Amino acid sequence: MTVLEAIQKSAEFLGKKNVEAPRLQAELLLAHLLKMPRMKLYLNFDRALTVAETDALRECIKRRGQREPLQHINGSTSFCGFEMTVNRHALIPRPETEQLAELGWQFLATINHQPSICLDFCTGSGCIAIAIAAKCPNAKIVAADISREALALAQENAAQNKLAERIEFLQGDGFAALAAGAQFDLIVSNPPYIPSAEIETLEPEVRDFDPRLALDGGADGLNFYRLVAAQAKPFLKPDGKLMLEFGDGQADAIKKIFESEKWIVEAVREDYSQRARILVARL
Ligand SMILES: C[S@@+](CC[C@H](N)C(=O)[O-])C[C@H]1O[C@@H](n2cnc3c(N)ncnc32)[C@H](O)[C@@H]1O
């Protein structure tokens, strides 16, 4: 079977399994397997696959047909240009979260006293902490999560990106993970925000493969925003900022939660599709 035939056959199979963008997915899986950029496949359409390559591709396509995410099959994804290993213990880093990380490192860059210190609350794979650490060479980052398995992955990702010495990993439930008296210039978080009952309606790639702990924001999806609004103040320095990602359609409710806890809501930022997705607040 040639590269082109393999792509066509795989795309047809994935299409029947209702996988979105089946041809692209087939190409990405084959390119990863052959260790070449996707575009290079186009120069190799006539190349014959070996038996071992065909068997490996068949296995990958079977898994993708069962709606396992591409990132889990390939074992990694890119976040702000940094390579992140992914597994079932942490949310796959999403492109929209890159904007939160960028706002975070832009703010830390304006701080005069150095080193600045940042908390990534609910760190998961560690993607936000790692991107900010990489972009702010003077910053120290604390990355907290309730899941030991997610923290093990985050530590692996920090080491892989040669940033382990500037990121401290803390396990615990909410702010109980932190030492009393700890204070940060920036608290950044992408917490779980899906209403519990909506989880069953999500695509299988999310519903069956992202950990429920990373998705479930309680009955209305807003539990973590109430928690942060009520408990984060003592952990923020007087000139510090809080930046939180939230779900599409949650902006008004979240703004109200923070204002009723006497936070100053500085901005609600939109993503590239003009949907409000990030809250910026201060004391
Ligand atoms: C939506 S994921 C975000 C992961 C990562 N920050 C990202 O943007 O890809 C939320 C994370 O919150 C963690 N989490 C859930 N409940 C928690 C709690 N009570 N205290 C601390 N972390 C919690 C989960 O383990 C998960 O890693």
Describe each region flagged by the PLM.
Residues 1-42, 46-49:
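Non-catalytic accessory regions of SAM-dependent methyltransferases
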Residues 14, 108, 158, 232, ...:
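Conserved hydrophobic residues forming the short capping helix/wall of the S-adenosyl-L-methionine
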Residues 29, 67, 97, 128, ...:
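Residue-level signal for inorganic ion chemistry
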Residues 30-107:
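Conserved AdoMet
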Residues 95-201:
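Conserved SAM/SAH cofactor-binding pocket of Class I
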Residues 163, 210, 236-238:
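Helix-to-beta-strand junctions that scaffold the AdoMet/dcAdoMet cofactor pocket
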Residues 193-223:
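Mobile active-site "lid"/loop adjacent to the S-adenosyl-L-methionine
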Residues 219-281:
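Conserved Class I SAM-dependent methyltransferase catalytic core
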